[in-house]
Design a protein with these regions (language model features):
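A broad, low-specificity signal marking well-ordered, structured residues that form hydrophobic/aromatic
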Residues: 49, 99, 141
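A generic structural signal for short, solvent-exposed coil/turn residues
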Residues: 1, 25-27, 43, 76-78, ...
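OB-fold ssDNA-binding interfaces and closely related basic DNA-contact patches used
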Residues: 1-40
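Non-Sec secretion/translocation targeting segments of pathogen effectors
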Residues: 133-143
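Short, cationic low-complexity segments
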Residues: 116-133
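Structured catalytic/translocation cores of nucleotide/phosphate-coupled proteins
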Residues: 2-3, 86, 143
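Short, compact, well-ordered microdomains
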Residues: 67-121
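Acidic, aromatic-enriched beta-alpha/helix-loop junctions
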Residues: 34-82
Length: 143
């Protein structure tokens, strides 16, 4: 079996080399992204990058809400590896606030080709037609 392509994840306990698993949530087919690492030669779940909030609005199939556990580190990870664009919208559930992100499906396909392809097929799109990150307007680029 081929070793998955990893990304560095920095957090308060150090640096982890993680790989992505792309899938969809069973209840509504929203985008799921999991963070995994190899433990004793086997893939082991490290954390969920996304959380399913079926009541919260999304702007497209490439959008998801970020799990609130270590969310600052997760948002930094997304920016660092250019996996998506952080949106201004948030959603609340219980006492938690979740940030919305528009993911670049082509970029996700670089790290989990099979999972991304299956997710896209489930939604009837091909990789060449994948939604990209929303382009930044001029004032955002100058920051």
């Amino acid at each position: 079996m081929e070793e998955p392509k990893t990304l560095s994840y920095d957090w308060q306990y150090g640096r982890e080399e993680l790989f992505l698993r792309v899938d969809s949530y069973m209840s509504d087919d929203n985008l799921y992204i999991g963070l995994y690492h190899m433990e004793d030669g086997y893939p082991e779940s490290f954390a969920d990058l996304t959380v399913n909030l079926p009541f919260a609005p999304l702007g497209g199939i490439n959008e998801a809400y970020i799990d609130h556990n270590f969310s600052k580190e997760k948002l930094r990870f997304i920016k660092q590896h250019k996996l998506g664009t952080i949106q201004p919208d948030t959603a609340s559930s219980g006492y938690c606030i979740f940030q919305r992100v528009a993911f670049d499906l082509k970029k996700l396909a670089e790290y989990d080709p099979q999972g991304t392809r299956e997710f896209m097929e489930c939604h009837g799109i091909q990789i060449k037609n994948a939604p990209k990150q929303k382009p930044k307007n001029k004032s955002q680029r100058e920051r």
